[in-house]
């Protein structure tokens, strides 16, 4: 069964692309009786406030018609930022050689949180270098991941 995020991704992908942006990912977070739906958009040259406003208007219109969310919700549209979340294996591939942070659904070696250099991706496995040791993690076990911004 598809998750709400997957359903929204499929429903909104084309509309966001028609506005010249990439739908980087979607997060849905329940806060009490309300839900926050976060859309992350990206494009070459960076995302502007106008891009976010245009996507927000278009997406709001689609959600009003399709009504896929049963509860009241707030819609947020933004760029992924420097510490961008990673949602798909192709997104992980873009950041090979960089530091990422990963939060797992099921602990590996009694740890849910890992941070290290993304070394490689093979099929559905990612390899991090953590304290000079390779740590192989199953993509399907990753709950959240993001690029670690370096300043």
Swiss-Prot record:
Q: Per the record's keyword annotation, is Phosphoprotein included, yes or no? A: no
Name the GO terms of the biological process aspect. Answer: ribosomal small subunit assembly; translation
**Gene3D superfamilies in the record, alphabetically?**
Ribosome maturation factor RimP, C-terminal domain, RimP-like superfamily, N-terminal
Q: Where, per UniProt, does this protein localize? A: Cytoplasm
Q: Which InterPro entries match?
A: Ribosome_maturation_RimP (IPR003728), RimP_C (IPR028998), RimP_C_sf (IPR036847), RimP_N (IPR028989), RimP_N_sf (IPR035956)
Would you tell me the Gene Ontology cellular component terms?
cytosol
Specify the domain of life of the species encoding this protein.
Bacteria
Name any one Pfam family assigned in the record. RimP_N
Entry keyword set: Cytoplasm, Ribosome biogenesis
Per the entry, what this protein does is: Required for maturation of 30S ribosomal subunits.
- Of which family is this protein a member? Belongs to the RimP family.
Q: What is this protein called?
A: Ribosome maturation factor RimP
Q: Which organism is it from?
A: Haemophilus influenzae (strain PittEE)
